[in-house]
Amino acid sequence: MRRRSFVRGLTATTAATGLGLTAAGHGHATAAAGGGNRPAGNARPRAAAWREVPVPAGEPAVLLNAVAAAGPDLAWAVGEEARSGSTSGRPLARTWDGSAWQATDVSHLAFAGSLRNVAAAPAGAAGAVAAWAVAYDRAGAGHLLAWDGATWREHDFPGRGESGTELWAVAVAPDGTVRISGTRDGGSRVLRSDDAGGTRWSWSPPLPTDDGTAPSLWNVHVDGAGATWVSGGVDVARYDDRAWHVLPRLAGLRLSVTDLLPTAPDDIWLTGHDYGAGGPPGKPPGVVLRHFDGTAWSDVAAPFTVGSLGAIAPDAAGRPALIAGWDFWDGASAHYLRWDGTAWTSERGPAAAQGVTPVMSALAPIPGTGGFWSAGTTAQSPFPPAQARIERYG
């Protein structure tokens, strides 16, 4: 699913402010506003049915930005390898064959950069491409990729190769048509396929913003009614193929939105982190979890407050189900949140090896199973020796 990588968010924050998490530890570093020490008596919940699943290593630093599943026997994870801080490396892809994750050869992709996002077509979508991915080229171009059964191949789209045209995230509607958030002609837009095979494409009008800027739309989703939802910066909006409907702007001093889950126009969930005002180098962010009720955004209590929430995933009915998080005070395992119908409750992933800090930035439900894939990296910062990490529930 599409979701902005926590590590990528850290990189953007570091580039803009000189802050990052490289100096953060698990004990006495300065917390973000609203954080503080872990409350006494807040015991670590058991790991439930989570387990780590081996994934082929790449050249560090390795980041998995997104994961998507077509079913129990086929899934895709995408990202990059050979990254160093804010300098992108090379595209990296992995494929689940029903028994193990395999390395996917993408050496034919003749660009340096990152595979940003991946989305799978739903079962039964006539004529649909099995999966789509979007990529970032360090030279400044956007790339659309289609799965051909063995690897990822470049796919044509209007604006391909144009300076200033960028593709951020991808989603597939129930009928197999595709929605991509991107930038073209100086505006933030949605690129839509008119057919499931991706032979005809059209761009939306630009997203209207209060300040006239064009935010990077890191997140895109299609709701049950077929409307496209996007988020970027402090902007969240819905495009119904006729017009934009912009929600109230998000409050936050140094806010990064990592993911978005719209279930209805009056039921929208949002995850991320916010560094707040001031603080020394190495200050960790505070968790952001918000809900929109059709009128206003409200903060929702999370089981931990210092760290980041990296992704949110629905259940088979499209209802909120699971959030992946990184807990600053206890980073020895991923800190998941599960929706019980009234509140988000703690659920821990498998314990990591010494020196490994799981930062899970992507989630995907596994159709037909009730399970989930979770993908990310093994360190707080995008430097060697960070490697890919994949966990599975169910």
Place the predicted regions along the sequence by residue.
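N-terminal export signals
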Residues: 5-25
